[in-house]
UniProtKB/Swiss-Prot annotation:
Keyword Cytoplasm: yes
PANTHER family: RIBOSOME MATURATION FACTOR RIMP (PTHR33867:SF1)
Main location, first listed in the record: cytoplasm
Organism ancestry: Bacteria, Bacillati, Bacillota, Bacilli, Bacillales
Localisation: Cytoplasm
Protein name: Ribosome maturation factor RimP
Keyword Cytoplasm in record: yes
């Protein structure tokens, strides 16, 4: 049996592609007593509430047709926000030159969390320039060791 997120991805991808948008992420989570199906969309120029509404309506119709979720849930369609997740290689490629927060599966140079400027991504390694006190240090992280990553808003 397919996971709910895979089914939703198959349903929503043609909708967002037709609208010239990008599917960023899908979450299906239980919070308290309620289930939430969250779909995050974006475009190079950003998205607006009307685009979210259209995607929500069209996806809701498709979900009603096949009914893959056996209980009540809330459908939310939105932008991924300023600290959008970096999930795919193309996300990292687009984020070069931006501030990021990266968690790794195992320690690299004695730590598992890094925040700084993403200076390079070659498909195999993620290179982040971090500040250590008053100096800058370059950390090279093997791509397969990245547990999670997102854009980071850094206040100086």
């Amino acid at each position: 049996m397919k996971k709910v997120t895979h089914i939703v991805e198959e349903l929503v991808t043609p909708i967002v592609t037709h609208m010239g948008l990008e599917l960023v992420d899908i979450e299906y989570v239980k919070e308290g007593k309620n289930w939430f199906l969250r779909v995050f969309i974006d475009s190079p120029t950003g998205i607006d509430i009307d685009q979210c509404g259209v995607v929500s309506e069209q996806l809701s119709e498709k979900l009603d047709e096949i009914d893959p979720i056996p209980h009540n849930y809330f459908l939310e369609v939105s932008s991924p926000g300023a600290e959008r997740p970096l999930k795919k290689a193309r996300d990292f490629e687009r984020a070069v030159g931006k501030n990021v927060y990266v968690k790794t599966y195992e320690p690299i140079d004695g730590q598992k969390e890094f925040e700084g400027l993403l200076t390079a991504f070659d498909g195999q390694t993620v290179t982040v320039e971090v500040k250590v006190k008053t100096k800058k240090k370059t950390i090279t992280i093997p791509y397969e060791k990245v547990a999670s990553a997102r854009l980071a808003v850094i206040f100086s």
